[in-house]
């Protein structure tokens, strides 16, 4: 399986944490 999807999701979560 490709980790691209997981990495994209993690980046999305990371961005959300940065906003907090």
Swiss-Prot record:
Belongs to the bacterial ribosomal protein bS20 family. GO terms for cellular component: ribonucleoprotein complex; ribosome. The gene is rpsT. The keyword rRNA-binding applies. Binds directly to 16S ribosomal RNA. One of its GO terms (molecular function) is rRNA binding. The lineage of its organism: Bacteria, Pseudomonadati, Pseudomonadota, Alphaproteobacteria, Caulobacterales. The keyword Ribonucleoprotein applies. It comes from Brevundimonas diminuta (Pseudomonas diminuta). Keywords: Ribonucleoprotein, Ribosomal protein, RNA-binding, rRNA-binding. This is Small ribosomal subunit protein bS20.
